[in-house]
Regions:
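Periplasmic alpha-helical coiled-coil/stalk elements that build and connect Gram-negative outer-membrane
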Residues: 2, 33-34, 58-60, 164-281, ...
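Membrane-embedded beta-strand positions in outer-membrane beta-barrel channels/transporters
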Residues: 135-137, 181, 311, 333-335, ...
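Bacterial Sec-pathway N-terminal export signals of envelope proteins
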Residues: 25-86, 216-218, 254-296, 300, ...
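A subset of solvent-exposed loop/turn segments in beta-rich extracellular surface proteins, enriched
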Residues: 82-125
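Acidic, low-complexity, intrinsically disordered peripheral segments
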Residues: 24, 32-33, 72-74, 79-98, ...
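Bacterial Sec-dependent N-terminal signal peptides
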Residues: 1-36, 40-43, 457-460
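Small/polar (Gly/Ser/Thr/Ala-rich) solvent-exposed segments
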Residues: 47, 71-85, 121-129, 139-168, ...
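Amphipathic alpha-helical coiled-coil segments
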Residues: 48-63, 169, 173-192, 210, ...
Length: 460
């Protein structure tokens, strides 16, 4: 015989198990959103992508800096082995010329000797032995032949590509955290199933004990109950192990304190399907498209090597005393550099970049085909999960009805304790299958959102 559970109790238990299936409009758990946010902040891979993006921004600044004027201050001291002077003939010529100019200035006839009382200026050195210089230089590229413009555009597209790669990585991390969180919810749901089974067994144990006292059952029945309880305890131990492992995984993914994660009691509520009808371009496709554009602009940059470049040069000396007779104090000049032939290097580099862009185009087309297939597979998996949930709910109804029937038969000595335990096991398995079905349903929706490129909007 068996103690019966009231119809109200059975209805209450059934409602508890059906709650998740009624939650199709539920949004993502706020706690799960917070864990995803912490996981994204902690991820080393995302941090590396962010640093790559910063490097791309620095590359843009470097390209822009080419067109900025460069100012350089210079200072030096040099000691020569001797003064640099004119040769003797040139010095004699300069002295004679000086005498002629003086004679003309004072009115002395050309053929008269030069007066000895008039001092002459010594011929200056071309360069003194000790040279102290201090100067400033200005170098300014006025036109780079479009190299800078194309380099900046290529770098901007590279930055955009890296941003999309980072977003794709965020989606993968979010999927991993959602799956781990759902596994933890499945473990807790399994615990609730075990608790229900434990209550059934406790009631059976109470009845069998009374039945043995009244001679209506044998001790074998009690031993079978005890064996079932031990098996249940083993499952409970497995639950604790799984819970510990999943909490550790969440800790590693999010950096959240283990004690706080232990306090979580997630529920397997179905995710919202409101966004499933939308489809957006995946971050992976956007990243490849931006990389393709970056390669094309890189090709243009390398081609522009043949366009003339225009630059301005300026120089100013602060110290004049040690300048040679040939050194200017300052100068300003403009120049053109035209690379007419470089041994086909620019052409080959440009061709290499074009081939790189063609590789990206092939990857884009392949990715689009794979994504289209993944959307179909995810959609079919989602529809299958919905159907599977309905089937499992029918199995629960059947297992529950069977258990009630066997309970009545056992009460009237028409069934053995083995039949009761088998019926209870079937009911327990059906409840487990329902929770696994809810888990699979959430997985299929998350994968469908990811395949359609709208997962980011779901967890942000």
């Amino acid at each position: 015989m068996q103690i019966n559970i009231s119809r109200f109790g059975i209805l209450f238990i059934a409602l508890i198990w059906l709650v998740p299936s009624m939650s199709m409009a539920q949004q993502l758990d706020p706690i799960l959103k917070e864990l995803i946010s912490k996981g994204l902040d902690k991820s080393h891979r995302i941090n590396v992508h962010d640093l790559d993006t910063e490097q791309a921004k620095v590359d843009q600044s470097l390209a822009k800096a080419v067109l900025l004027p460069k100012v350089t201050f210079n200072g030096s001291f040099t000691r020569l082995d001797d003064d640099i002077t004119f040769d003797d003939d040139t010095q004699n010529l300069l002295i004679a010329t000086q005498k002629l100019l003086i004679k003309e200035a004072v009115g002395i006839p050309f053929n008269d000797p030069f007066p000895g009382n008039i001092p002459l200026t010594e011929v200056a050195n071309l360069q003194d032995q000790n040279i102290l210089k201090s100067s400033v230089d200005l170098d300014w590229v006025l036109f780079s032949g479009l190299e800078v413009t194309n380099a900046i555009r290529a770098s901007k597209h590279k930055e955009a590509s890296l941003n999309y790669v980072g977003n794709a990585e965020k989606d993968k991390i979010a999927l991993t955290i959602i799956e781990t969180y759902d596994k933890l919810a499945l473990v807790y749901a399994s615990k609730r199933v075990l608790t229900t089974s434990e209550n059934y067994l406790n009631e059976q144990e109470f009845y069998v004990k009374k039945a043995i006292e009244n001679g209506l059952a044998t001790p074998i029945s009690r031993k079978k109950i005890e064996l079932a309880q031990q098996q249940l305890a083993s499952k409970a131990l497995e639950f604790n192990h799984n819970k510990t492992v999943l909490i550790e995984v969440l800790h590693q993914l999010t950096g959240e304190n283990r004690e706080n994660l232990t306090l979580l009691h997630p529920q397997l509520q179905s995710l919202s399907t409101a966004l499933v009808s939308n489809t957006e371009k995946r971050n992976e496709i956007r990243a490849l498209e931006e990389a393709e554009k970056a390669s094309l602009y890189k090709s243009k940059m390398e081609k522009s090597n043949f366009i003339p470049k225009l630059a301005l040069k300026g120089h100013y000396e602060f110290i004049e005393d040690d300048l040679s007779l040939l050194d200017p104090k300052w100068f300003v000049g403009a120049g053109i550099k035209w690379n007419v032939f470089d041994g086909f290097q620019s052409h080959l580099k440009s061709k290499k970049s074009i081939i790189e862009s063609q590789k990206y185009r092939e990857q884009i087309e392949e990715a689009e085909e794979m994504i289209a297939l993944s959307i179909i597979e995810a959609q079919l998996t989602y529809e299958s999960s919905l159907q599977n949930t309905k089937i499992v709910q029918k199995e629960i109804d059947l297992a529950s009805a069977t258990y009630n029937m066997v309970d009545k038969q056992f009460k009237n000595n028409l069934a053995s304790i083995n039949d009761v335990l088998d019926a209870l096991t079937d009911l327990e398995k059906a409840h487990f299958k329902l929770q696994e079905s809810f888990f699979g349903q959430r997985r299929s929706i998350a994968n469908l959102l990811h395949a359609k490129g709208i997962l980011t909007a779901f967890y942000n």
